[in-house]
Curated annotation (Swiss-Prot):
Belongs to the DEAD box helicase family. RhlB subfamily. The lineage of its organism: Bacteria, Pseudomonadati, Pseudomonadota, Gammaproteobacteria, Enterobacterales. The gene is rhlB. PROSITE patterns: DEAD_ATP_HELICASE, HELICASE_ATP_BIND_1, HELICASE_CTER, Q_MOTIF. This is ATP-dependent RNA helicase RhlB. It catalyses: ATP + H2O = ADP + phosphate + H(+). Residues 40-219 form the Helicase ATP-binding domain. Residues 392-430 are annotated as: Disordered.
Length: 430
């Protein structure tokens, strides 16, 4: 991993609890990223923080280190009961909650603080069994948290730290009432440490969030540059008829080690998945219709490298840290400008370089001007030769068919290339 995204500030330079420093260093974390270097001095002094930084810059570790330090440095309420967690971390999606919990496990092993996880979809009794034994830090989604609270399985009266992760997404998804319901059951803002982190924070979000924070300090990293400078962007104008052929030709040319393809609807994602699966790619599908256990399995397979391509709706565009994603394809230009930033932010993370390739088809090209205005620059345009597109593609697979294994050996570059798929099939537009 590249070190160029790190600062010269060491975690050991801060007055972090020794167990936190030991846990961080045992996992190879010695130097801070910019958002960590900005946020930690504030949280260690007891100040509330609202942090804005691009995805992949270490927001999760910033609030986890702060949370563990605070709990280790401040005693629990003497009257705290078993069903009362000391810290609550709220996330907008199940996948993000699972990921935060996984990251927190790296710190919990050496600190002795117990973790709990609460998210909807499945695992109700399994999650509840952990909570019944008592947890210090509870990570979850708002719906399941409220469910447990109403059933008195958890009580928020002893909360000392609260975190809102991907806060703008929380509000955009309509969770503001749920968040306020949970906050009303916690101690007053002045009696707890409050943190809010996201890649984008609108003024509306900041105003709503500050209702639940104690004179929070606002910190940001690279606020004027909405897309990472390590991401190379590229744009094509395909016709609807050539769009799929162009995508598959680009995949042949780029041969990405690990890529995510975003489309705007679950039906479009299923169609893209079907074409790529039929063509022999090791591809996974992530939409809202995919069962929770399968979603987690697909993410694990993608992270571990047993599948190379993930086709997804924007359910996977927020917060998830999947290392070493080399390419992002916008098969559809998103309707929301912020989603473009979050999508391509899946690559070029943690000091690595990445590539973003967008297809501005007849249906979604109208979204381009607003996106370019929002990111503050035009996306470089490339042209392609229609006659050179792949033209012997198999019929797409359908989800209703018995699934064919996509986890076989990956095709090698030495395999015969089919007609119509020469490399360097494109050139920059003048």
């Amino acid at each position: 991993m590249s070190k160029t995204h790190l600062t010269e500030q060491k975690f050991s330079d801060f007055a972090l609890h020794p167990q936190v420093i030991e846990a961080l260093e045992s996992k190879g974390f010695h130097y801070c990223t910019p958002i960590q270097a900005l946020a930690l001095p504030l949280t260690l002094s007891g100040r509330d923080v609202a942090g804005q930084a691009q995805t992949g810059t270490g927001k999760t570790l910033a609030f986890l280190a702060s949370t563990f330090h605070y709990l280790l440095s401040h005693p629990a309420n003497a009257e705290r009961q078993t069903n009362q967690p000391r810290a609550l971390i709220m996330a907008p999606t199940r996948e993000l909650a699972v990921q935060i919990h996984s990251d927190a496990e790296a710190l919990s092993h050496l600190t002795g603080l117990k973790l709990g996880l609460a998210y909807g979809g499945d695992g109700y009794d399994k999650q509840l069994k952990v909570l019944e034994n008592g947890v210090d830090i509870l990570v979850g989604t708002t719906g399941r948290l409220i469910d447990y609270a109403k059933q008195n399985h958890i009580n928020l009266g002893a909360i000392q730290v609260v975190v809102l992760d991907e806060a703008d997404r929380m509000y955009d998804l309509g969770f503001i009432k749920d968040i306020r319901w949970l906050f009303r059951r916690m101690p007053a803002t002045s009696q707890r440490l409050n943190m809010l982190f996201s890649a984008t924070l609108s003024y509306r979000v900041r105003e709503l969030a500050f209702e639940q924070m104690n004179n929070a300090e606002y910190v940001e990293v690279e606020p004027e540059q909405k897309t990472g400078h390590r991401i190379t962007e590229e744009l094509f104008y395909p016709s609807n008829e050539e769009k799929m052929r162009l995508l598959q030709t680009l995949l042949e040319e780029e041969w990405p080690d690990r890529c995510i393809i975003f489309a705007n609807t679950k039906h479009r994602c299923e169609d893209v998945w079907g074409h790529l699966a039929a063509d022999g790619h090791r591809v996974g599908l992530l939409t809202g219709d995919v069962a929770q256990k399968k979603r987690l399995r697909i993410l694990e397979e993608f992270t571990q490298g047993s599948i190379d391509i993930l086709v997804a709706t924007d359910v996977a565009a927020r917060g998830l840290h999947i290392p070493s994603v080399t390419h992002v394809f916008n098969y559809d230009l998103p309707d929301d400008c912020e989603d473009y930033v979050h999508r391509i932010g899946r690559t070029g993370r943690a000091g690595q370089s990445g590539f973003s390739i967008s297809l501005a088809c007849e249906e979604y090209a109208l979204n381009l001007p607003a996106i370019e205005t929002y990111i503050g620059h035009g996306i470089p345009l490339s042209k392609y030769n229609s006659d050179a597109l792949m033209n012997d593609l198999p019929a797409p697979k359908r989800l209703t068919r018995p699934p064919r294994s996509n986890n076989g050996p990956r095709r090698h570059n030495s395999a015969p290339r089919r007609s119509g798929a020469p490399r360097n099939n494109r050139k920059r537009a003048d």
